[in-house]
UniProtKB/Swiss-Prot annotation:
The gene is H1-1. GO terms for molecular function: chromatin DNA binding; DNA binding; double-stranded DNA binding; heparin binding; nucleosomal DNA binding; structural constituent of chromatin. Interacts with DFFB. The modification N-acetylserine is found at residue 2. It comes from Rattus norvegicus. Residues 38-111 form the H15 domain. H1 histones are progressively phosphorylated during the cell cycle, becoming maximally phosphorylated during late G2 phase and M phase, and being dephosphorylated sharply thereafter. This is Histone H1.1. The C-terminal domain is required for high-affinity binding to chromatin. The keyword rRNA-binding does not apply.
Length: 214
């Protein structure tokens, strides 16, 4: 039996690696500014709570916290803020401390501060109404602009009138020139040159001599 030679196997080709895609760096996000909490600040809430109370001796810290909690303010988390707000209001002169020292005590609204608070409320309302009215003006101005824009395409009509009138002028001028030119040619007649004819003078005939008498 004839031995069959083993068939050589082709060298294993290594699979091509796909080109590594470059990682695109994402742009760093800009630091988002912290949003201020919507609504009045702690000091404003304290002033409102003290002004609403009818106690002549002043509002205690416990009573103030109750009124703030009823308004929906988180008293437990913002306990330190309430104390700082009370101290700052006392230092500014908006609140007067009738009893105790520091944050622990009773507080009453200063009469001068009451007049200032009323004026600030009026100015805030006026600013809010002015800000609300401004967008109406801009909307009206935008409407006027949109109305005025379609009037511009009417201008080409004037150019059509001028173009229709312009060809009439050369026709009139040409007609006049053609009418005048033959008249001039007829009026001018060439003058014939006058030639003077000199007549030849005939010689004088000799007179016959008279016969002499015998």
């Amino acid at each position: 039996m004839s031995e069959t030679a083993p068939v050589p196997q082709p060298a294993s080709v290594a699979p091509e690696k796909p080109a590594a895609t470059k990682k695109t760096r994402k742009p760093a996000k800009a630091a988002v500014p912290r949003k201020k909490p919507a609504g009045p600040s702690v000091s404003e809430l304290i002033v409102q709570a003290v002004s609403s109370s009818k106690e002549r001796s002043g509002v205690s810290l416990a009573a103030l916290k109750k009124s703030l909690a009823a308004a929906g303010y988180d008293v437990e988390k913002n306990n330190s803020r309430i104390k700082l707000g009370l101290k700052s209001l006392v230092n500014k002169g908006t609140l007067v401390q009738t009893k105790g020292t520091g944050a622990a005590g009773s507080f009453k609204l200063n009469k001068k501060a009451e007049s200032k608070a009323s004026t600030t409320k009026v100015t805030v309302k006026a600013k809010a109404s002015g800000a609300a009215k401004k967008p109406k003006k801009t909307a009206g101005a935008a409407a006027k602009k949109t109305v005025k824009t379609p009037k511009k395409p009417k201008k080409p009509a004037v150019s059509k009138k001028t173009s229709s009138k312009s060809p009439k002028k050369p026709k009139v001028v040409k007609a006049k020139k053609v009418a005048k030119s033959p008249a001039k040619a007829k009026a001018v007649k060439p003058k014939a040159a006058k030639v003077k004819v000199t007549k030849p003078k005939t010689p004088a005939k000799p007179k016959k001599a008279a016969p002499k008498k015998k």
